[in-house]
Amino acid sequence: MKTNFVILLLLLCVFAISPSQQEEINQHNPGIYHQKLLYKVQQWRTSLKESNSVELKLSLAAIVAGVLYFLAALISSACGIGSGGLFIPITTLVSRLDLKTGKRFLGQYLIWVILLLGQLHECKSCIEKERVALLDFKKYWMSITQESDLDYVFPTWNNDTKSDCCQWESIMCNPTSGRLIRLHVGASNLKENSLLNISLLHPFEEVRSLELSAGLNGFVDNVEGYKSLRKLKNLEILDLSYNNRFNNNILPFINAATSLTSLSLQNNSMEGPFPFEEIKDLTNLKLLDLSRNILKGPMQGLTHLKKLKALDLSNNVFSSIMELQVVCEMKNLWELDLRENKFVGQLPLCLGRLNKLRVLDLSSNQLNGNLPSTFNRLESLEYLSLLDNNFTGFFSFDPLANLTKLKVFKLSSTSDMLQIKTESEPKYQFQLSVVVIRVCSLEKIPSFLEYQKNLRLVDLSNNRLSGNLPTWLLANNPELKVLQLQDNLFTIFQMPATIVHELQFLDFSVNDISGLLPDNIGYALPNLLRMNGSRNGFQGHLPSSMGEMVNITSLDLSYNNFSGKLPRRFVTGCFSLKHLKLSHNNFSGHFLPRETSFTSLEELRVDSNSFTGKIGVGLLSSNTTLSVLDMSNNFLTGDIPSWMSNLSGLTILSISNNFLEGTIPPSLLAIGFLSLIDLSGNLLSGSLPSRVGGEFGIKLFLHDNMLTGPIPDTLLEKVQILDLRYNQLSGSIPQFVNTESIYILLMKGNNLTGSMSRQLCDLRNIRLLDLSDNKLNGFIPSCLYNLSFGPEDTNSYVGTAITKITPFKFYESTFVVEDFVVISSSFQEIEIKFSMKRRYDSYFGATEFNNDVLDYMYGMDLSSNELSGVIPAELGSLSKLRVMNLSCNFLSSSIPSSFSNLKDIESLDLSHNMLQGSIPQQLTNLSSLVVFDVSYNNLSGIIPQGRQFNTFDEKSYLGNPLLCGPPTNRSCDAKKTSDESENGGEEEDDEAPVDMLAFYFSSASTYVTTLIGIFILMCFDCPLRRAWLRIVDASIASVKSMLP
């Protein structure tokens, strides 16, 4: 009720305007909707304040009109009329009233008033026939819906006779007749091959709009057949988009609906040539949307649709530029959307015939050449997009010079051969509101921009522009809201001293700007919402004037050379900041030692600076909103303060590579929403916390500290990544509480002892396992073949990417909404160090591009332990493994031939063990193998050759004196070489036990022969026998003398 009174008061203000202003309303807004009305009211009231010549008067007509508007609002609300209801006809009526016609109101519009008031006395509910039909429709719909979703099928539709079906969801009725005029059925979980029985819609004789985006396969009517839709003689709008299962067999049904003015078949997976001939009877069609399918030419048959004004063929696979000849014959077109197809070649000259065309979108094709000269005939053109094409050579704007109505122009090229032809004379007659010329190898700003006065969005990014930033664009265009100049070669940024502008989005990142940020930037741009000046060469202090940017929500100045302390005015004045990125600079001093005004801060990144001292209490200003905090790579000292656990909204915390001491506060790891915590590279001591908080998988980095004691079993309950490398942890490998979530486990360089737990075999989602440089002993469990070491349903990224559409709408039409999209990303890069190919490298994940190297790394490192026994042949089933390192242990027996199944292996290190036998010839099938090291073992036989083995040098085989052949300098016996080549190395596996048997036999024979010889010698009387007996007697006498 309060809303209705406000509308009434607004209307009274509306009619207190001049006749000329009222005439403008009549011409441009014959039907005013609510939000447009409020905008107009504000606009007109502003203009009245600027004009003192207009006297505010209130006519009787205005009062009557306002009352009618109020009554219509009240009744529309009571009758459940959506989208305007009675507002539209009454607004159309009262918008014709002004002060001059007010006196003639009762005479000229009396009949309309009588008819209107006659209809206001009551609202009609839905008729019984249609209520029953709706219940039948619901029953049928439930029969084709999956059982799991039955409770969601039109829950407000019930069989209560007191229930007004006009109030049901998805329904709109005519307020006077009570007849259904709109039926909307959204996405549903339907059974396969579900067909809609159109005869169920026949009772709705006055329906005007059918929206069936539900997942149907088609239509059926066993009585009327293809002619079924002709029963709906008032049907004007048919929306069948997003069904995804339709094909061309529905077109005969649609062709019968000859009253249609709007048809949408968007996103239905329709393939092949579209049979336009099958909808040739839709002669009243004004809008046709076939976007997001897999359609291709020819387009013959489109010419039958002579009244068509809007055609959307975007996101298909049309390719031949000659197919547009058919489109050129459609001279009544207002909008033509052909973006994201595969059109190749130059634009045809015939497009110039479409002199009524207002919107033309040709973006994301493979067009080349230049604009046709005939484009100068497109006198109605308002919107032209040529983004993401393959334009080359000189590109001229001359064909657009006389297009006085042009408001939006967009151009970019996938080729680096494009050169923009610039003009020196101001001959262009258009006044643009949006200009986008990006990725065009532009070296000079087009001169026509100097004469534009109404620009609201300018995007000149990804070019080769140099010199001064074009701040003159601000002076010339007071309504400019968005200025994007990133990825250029600008070197100087100077702000005019006197300017104060309304600019809200400024991006000049990735340039070559050096020197100081302008001192007056905060005064000149006080209304900025977002500013990105990252990846430049700025130096010096932050200007204190930035504290005047009270509305700024995002500031990114990372990757520069700023220095000094953060200005006090900055940390107290920018109270709207949500995202602050100052990474990779030289800021110094204590970090936020006092309270700040950052009460809304969600993301704070100050990593890789020179901040010193303890972690400042200023962080507590945003204790409930702060989600991302990165203070890594600074010079922070002291303990980790216990109050940091009050930052209850933290999801990412990184304070690695500082000089923090003391123990880890258990309450810090108990924060409920943490997804990543990195405390590595400090001087932390004490034991590990017993558990971590959070409901999701946590990535925990504690490596390179001085932590001691055992690893608690409960610590592993919720982790996805656990990095404990290079501490002083002891005890055995913990019992894993939850083995499903862990996919990176790194425990290198500790003092772990005992055998390898068989629970390691339950790490089914593991990608990287590093237990090297410990004191583990015993056998390698053969059950390790259970490990996946391959792509699973896990990913290494941490963070969010938020897409936000700003409130600006620079242009809007049937198919096009030109607004400004802001993407805010809060990704945290993950660094994992792992030994591969004889190097200890870093592998990164969690970048914004989702092609992280870390996502493709699968490895196992058990080196530098005390493991013994045989290498389990079952390890050969780890086919996705890229790295295996078993070096520096006490492993014996032979190399399993099953290792030939390691198809993706790149690095295999078995060096410094006690392996015997030969190298299996089958290993030459490992086509990805780059590093192979079996040095310092007891291997023998011929070194295999072929494929990757031809690339390995002698270092791979050092310390194996019984190996022969290339690349060693030891030759092999010719016969042995022949035998081994014939046997393919398979018999070599049996050589080890045969050689050992011969060794044992020869040793025993020698021992027995020696004993027999001594015995025989004693049986003969000879000087040797007597000498031996004397020695024995002397020895006995000596022993007796020693006894008491």
Curated annotation (Swiss-Prot):
Region Disordered, annotated ranges: 969-990
LRR repeats: 204-231, 232-255, 257-281, 282-305, 306-329, 331-354, 355-377, 379-402, 404-427, 429-452, 453-476, 478-500, 501-525, 527-549, 550-573, 575-600, 602-622, 623-647, 648-671, 673-695, 697-716, 717-740, 742-763, 764-787, 854-877, 878-901, 902-926, 928-951
Disulfide pairings: none
Protein name: Receptor-like protein 8
Record key words, sorted: Cell membrane, Glycoprotein, Leucine-rich repeat, Membrane, Receptor, Repeat, Signal, Transmembrane, Transmembrane helix
Signal peptide (from-to): 1-22
Acidic residues bias: start-end ranges: 980-990
Cytoplasmic topological segments: 1018-1044
SUPFAM superfamilies in UniProt: L domain-like (SSF52058), Outer arm dynein light chain 1 (SSF52075), RNI-like (SSF52047)
